[in-house]
């Protein structure tokens, strides 16, 4: 009997997790079954169970691969790495413009799956514990929360921002608002109701621009004076406007 190579195992498992990802885009995460994956891959039941013990084991590996494939951590570090030359408002503008880019690109991909996992967590916390328990890699939003909390605390200590709440409360607000925007945009994209007068506003870039303005107000961000500030504000504004102009 020929020896099974590591490459063979990796390729087989990737076919299984790729099938799971495709199915999660077509259906809700909670309704994807092991039989669905068997049918999609063409593998036998034993061929699937050889590598994974159940559907949640597959989801866990799928999410790990998603986090490796689509990461915004370097972009977060790049923006926060300019804290000495950019004002807090400019940093906030750039972070949220980056999030708008990410949400637009992944709205019906990773963002959809992430949202449906949060719904599953409410209904079946035992399953989420199994799915997420073995994942060591820090997710995009977890990393953003950790890094921005450090940044806000540092800027407050330097007197560059003047928030009327602590960093933990501020990040809790941002996280909750982001989750609401994510849900609204996904639902609007899946079940667009043309009679709703707000439908046209339920777009990632538009709503995240509103959140940016709210956060800048909450932190009391002060723009530095001079040409650089004007130039930076104009450049950041363009980050938000570019897609809005394309949609009009």
Give the role of each language-model region:
Residues 5, 12, 16-19:
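N-terminal positioning helix adjacent to the helix-turn-helix/winged-helix DNA-binding module
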Residues 15, 23-65:
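Helix-turn-helix
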Residues 70-74:
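Predominantly extracellular/luminal regions of secreted and cell-surface proteins
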Residues 89-90, 108-116, 123-158, 169:
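Amphipathic alpha-helical packing segments from all-alpha helical-bundle domains
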Residues 97-101, 146, 150-158, 172-248:
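C-terminal peripheral helix-coil segments that are non-catalytic and often amphipathic
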